[in-house]
């Protein structure tokens, strides 16, 4: 992955956040022989790309959580980052422990509703059980409503309808077109065709107005969702929310107040350095870059940032990162999918074989040097 370099004792990279970007940066730095510490709230990496599959298939969740300690040993610290002191170059943890850094990689990702994300500080075993509990709730429900028709929402609706074809599944979306706005129209049309062919009912260009008054992820008969047009209501047994993803900025916002974009992401230059800070990088969802927030891009950012840390230490030119043509694969259940790569349409069979079968979980286990459970 990279040749090892000789560095001074004062060199220490702190990586804040252990999502796709964080583990990619840590793995790259490890291969370079550059000292680092990875900090995360959880004790295990969550392969949240596969969280929706874990919501419908019993036993799958244990494949989506991978121990940090088993991969990074003493280079991992479990803790909550509550502040960053740029003057003293220290990361401050909730426990009052302070981590000295020569370089900082911020990879805090984004927060969003369960089941797409796990935001609570719980153990790997507890997290797995939360998904197993949701599988049971979905199994109990006769009518499931998915709120939000972005990429997560369409995948969620497809997962439920694929594994439980007898259930009524409704998808409510505030816009007319489904999935990510940057996708080719042909991809978005195919997404709609797949959902309709599976029997998913689509309610488009409507918003749920009482979502904050409804309990999500728990089967409850006669749950009523109010829509914003024509006084329409939808009555169901279970609500799954796939909207409202926000940048996780709480750990760094006070340190970089004038370097934040409107959504809380950090403004970076072409080298992924935070504006005005040559030794601080932002990667993944928390970097302000005009492209969809995806694990695929987060990994690329992280490898560029880690390489630039190395290059800065050995006097080489830094690598630049420029968003290219969009690449995105949508898993529409285990047996279907659609997407595009570098702007080119990818057909359903290809995406099914490339992503939909295991949602790349085996790839993450391999990259972290561990054996995936059967």
Curated annotation (Swiss-Prot):
- Cysteines paired by S-S bonds: none
Entry keyword Oxidoreductase: yes
Q: Where is this site: 4-hydroxy-2-nonenal adduction?
A: 173
Which terms are listed as keywords in the entry?
A: Acetylation, Apoptosis, Cell membrane, Cytoplasm, FAD, Flavoprotein, Lipid droplet, Lipoprotein, Membrane, Mitochondrion, Myristate, Nucleus, Oxidoreductase, Transmembrane, Transmembrane helix, Ubl conjugation
Location (main, coarse): other
Q: Where in the cell is it found?
A: Lipid droplet; Cell membrane; Cytoplasm; Mitochondrion membrane
Q: Which GO terms describe its biological process?
A: apoptotic process; vitamin K metabolic process
**Ways its activity is controlled:** The modification by 4-hydroxy-2-nonenal (HNE) adduction in mitochondria results in loss of the oxidoreductase activity and activation of a novel function in mitochondrial oxidative stress signaling.
N-myristoyl glycine lipid sites: 2
Name residues in a coiled coil.
none
Q: Which residues carry this modification: N6-acetyllysine?
A: 167
Which catalytic reaction applies to this protein? ubiquinone-10 + NADH + H(+) = ubiquinol-10 + NAD(+); phylloquinone + NADH + H(+) = phylloquinol + NAD(+); menaquinone-4 + NADH + H(+) = menaquinol-4 + NAD(+); menadione + NADH + H(+) = menadiol + NAD(+)
Sequence positions that bind 6-hydroxy-FAD: 17-21, 53, 81, 285
> Which membrane topology term applies here?
Lipid-anchor
Cofactor note from UniProt? Binds 6-hydroxy-FAD non-covalently.
Its post-translational modification remark reads: N-myristoylation at Gly-2 mediates the recruitment to lipid droplets and plasma membrane. Acetylation at Lys-167 prevents AIFM2 ubiquitination and degradation, thereby inhibiting ferroptosis. KAT2B mediates acetylation at Lys-167, while HDAC3 removes it.
Question: Which metal ions or organic cofactors does this protein require, according to UniProt?
Answer: 6-hydroxy-FAD
Question: What molecular functions are annotated in GO for this chain?
Answer: oxidoreductase activity, acting on NAD(P)H, quinone or similar compound as acceptor
Family that this chain belongs to: Belongs to the FAD-dependent oxidoreductase family.
Q: What does this protein do?
A: A NAD(P)H-dependent oxidoreductase that acts as a key inhibitor of ferroptosis. At the plasma membrane, catalyzes reduction of coenzyme Q/ubiquinone-10 to ubiquinol-10, a lipophilic radical-trapping antioxidant that prevents lipid oxidative damage and consequently ferroptosis. Acts in parallel to GPX4 to suppress phospholipid peroxidation and ferroptosis. This anti-ferroptotic function is independent of cellular glutathione levels.
Q: What is this protein called?
A: Ferroptosis suppressor protein 1
The species this protein belongs to is Xenopus tropicalis
| Name of the gene | aifm2
């Amino acid at each position: 992955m990279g040749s090892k370099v000789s560095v001074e004792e004062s060199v220490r990279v702190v990586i804040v956040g252990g999502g796709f970007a964080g583990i990619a940066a840590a793995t790259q730095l490890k291969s370079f022989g550059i000292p680092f510490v990875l900090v995360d709230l959880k004790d295990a990496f969550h392969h949240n790309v596969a969280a929706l599959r874990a919501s419908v298939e019993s036993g799958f969740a244990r494949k989506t959580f991978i121990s940090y300690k088993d991969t990074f040993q003493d280079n991992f610290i479990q803790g909550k980052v509550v502040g960053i002191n740029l003057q003293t170059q220290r990361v401050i943890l909730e426990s009052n422990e302070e981590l000295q850094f020569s370089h900082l990689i911020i990879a805090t990702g984004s927060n969003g509703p369960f089941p797409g994300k796990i935001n609570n500080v719980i153990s790997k075993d507890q997290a797995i059980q939360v998904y197993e509990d949701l599988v049971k709730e979905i199994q109990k429900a006769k009518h499931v409503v998915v709120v939000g028709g972005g990429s997560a929402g369409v995948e969620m609706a497809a997962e439920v309808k694929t594994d439980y074809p007898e259930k009524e599944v409704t998808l409510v979306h505030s816009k007319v077109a489904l999935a990510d706005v940057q996708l080719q129209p042909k991809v978005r049309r195919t997404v709609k065709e797949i959902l309709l062919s599976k029997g998913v009912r689509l309610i488009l260009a409507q918003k749920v107005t009482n979502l904050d008054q409804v309990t999500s992820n728990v089967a409850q008969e006669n749950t009523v969702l109010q829509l914003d047009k024509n006084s329409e209501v939808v009555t169901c047994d279970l609500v799954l929310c796939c909207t409202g993803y926000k940048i996780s900025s709480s750990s760094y916002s006070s340190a970089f107040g004038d370097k934040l974009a409107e959504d809380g992401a950090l403004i970076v230059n072409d080298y992924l350095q935070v504006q005005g800070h040559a030794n601080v990088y932002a990667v993944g969802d928390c970097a302000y870059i005009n492209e969809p927030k995806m694990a695929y891009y987060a990994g690329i950012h992280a490898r560029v940032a880690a390489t630039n840390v190395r290059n800065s230490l050995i006097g080489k030119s830094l690598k630049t990162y420029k968003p290219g043509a969009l690449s995105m694969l949508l898993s529409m259940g285990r047996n279907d999918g659609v997407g595009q790569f570098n702007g080119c349409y990818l057909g359903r069979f290809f995406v099914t074989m490339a992503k939909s079968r295991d949602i790349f979980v085996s790839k993450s286990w391999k990259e972290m040097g561990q054996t995936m459970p059967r």
